Curated annotation (Swiss-Prot):
E.C. number: 6.3.5.2
The organism's place on the tree of life at top rank: Archaea
Matching Gene3D superfamilies: 3.40.50.880
CDD domains referenced in this protein's UniProt entry, alphabetically: GATase1_GMP_Synthase
Disulfide partners: none
Protein name (Swiss-Prot/TrEMBL): GMP synthase [glutamine-hydrolyzing] subunit A
Organism: Sulfurisphaera tokodaii (strain DSM 16993 / JCM 10545 / NBRC 100140 / 7)
Cited function: Catalyzes the synthesis of GMP from XMP.
A GO-annotated cellular component: cytosol
Subunit structure: Heterodimer composed of a glutamine amidotransferase subunit (A) and a GMP-binding subunit (B).
Gene: guaAA
Domain Glutamine amidotransferase type-1: 2-188
Lineage, uppermost ranks: Archaea, Thermoproteota, Thermoprotei, Sulfolobales, Sulfolobaceae
Pfam families associated with the record: GATase
Record-linked NCBIfam families: guaA_Nterm, PRK00758.1
Length: 188
C-alpha cells in the first residue's frame, strides 16, 4: 500500500512516515506545491500538521484545497490536516478559546473505525491554537476533550477522518492504533 503524507512543514510529519514504515507500508512525504495529479498513484492520503492557520493562511498551503476536493482516496487529517478537511468540506474552524499543548485527555464518544480499541479515553499529544467547532455536514464527532468539542470526526462513508491530536507522537497512548485503523479503512 502506498500512502501520501502531505507535508505542511510540521515538526512531527516525519514521525507519521516512520510509523507507517514500521507498519510495513510505503509512505512518502509530499509538499503541497506538487500538482494534484501526483496523488493518483497513492492508495490513501494523510494530511499532516503544520504552522499554518486554515482560517487566514489557506493561500499559503499550495494545492491543499485541490488535494481535498479533487481526490477520491480515503483521507486522514492530523491537527492542521484535521482543520483543513473540516474547513474545505464546509465545517467551521476558529481560534481555540483555550489552545491545547502537551498531553490532553481525549474522550472517545464513538469507537468508530479510526478509534477502534481506544475507548473510553486516551492521553494524547496536542499542539494547536485553532480548532474545529463544527464538522462538515454528514460528518459525526467521534471524540472530544475538555477544551475541544471535535477531537475526531468521520464522514458518513467512513472514508474521511480527522483527529486534532497527534497519533504519531510517542506520548499519545495507542497512537499507532489510529494508523492501523486508518489502513484497514483504506483497504475497504
Amino acid at each position: 500500500m502506498k500512502i501520501a503524507v502531505i507535508y505542511f512543514g510540521g515538526q512531527y510529519n516525519h514521525l507519521i512516515v516512520k510509523d507507517l514504515k514500521y507498519l510495513g507500508l510505503n509512505a512518502v512525504l509530499i509538499t503541497p506545491e506538487k500538482p494534484v495529479e501526483i496523488l493518483k498513484d497513492y492508495d490513501c492520503i494523510i494530511f499532516g500538521g503544520g504552522p499554518y492557520s486554515v482560517i487566514t493562511e489557506l493561500n499559503k498551503m499550495g494545492n491543499a484545497v485541490d488535494y481535498v476536493l479533487r481526490t477520491s482516496q480515503p483521507k486522514l487529517g492530523i491537527c492542521l490536516g484535521h482543520q483543513l478537511l473540516a474547513k474545505v468540506l464546509g465545517g467551521e474552524v476558529t481560534k481555540a478559546t483555550k489552545p491545547e499543548y502537551g498531553l490532553v485527555k481525549v474522550n472517545i464518544n464513538d469507537e468508530d473505525t479510526i478509534l477502534r480499541g481506544l475507548s473510553p479515553s486516551i492521553n494524547a499529544w496536542e499542539s494547536h491554537t485553532d480548532e474545529v467547532i463544527s464538522p462538515p455536514q454528514g460528518f459525526r464527532i467521534l471524540a472530544n476533550s475538555e477544551n475541544a468539542k471535535v477531537q475526531a470526526m468521520v464522514n458518513k462513508d467512513n472514508t474521511i477522518f480527522g483527529v486534532q491530536f497527534h497519533p504519531e507522537v510517542k506520548h499519545t497512548e495507542k497512537g499507532i492504533e489510529v494508523f492501523k485503523n486508518f489502513i484497514e479503512a483504506c483497504k475497504k
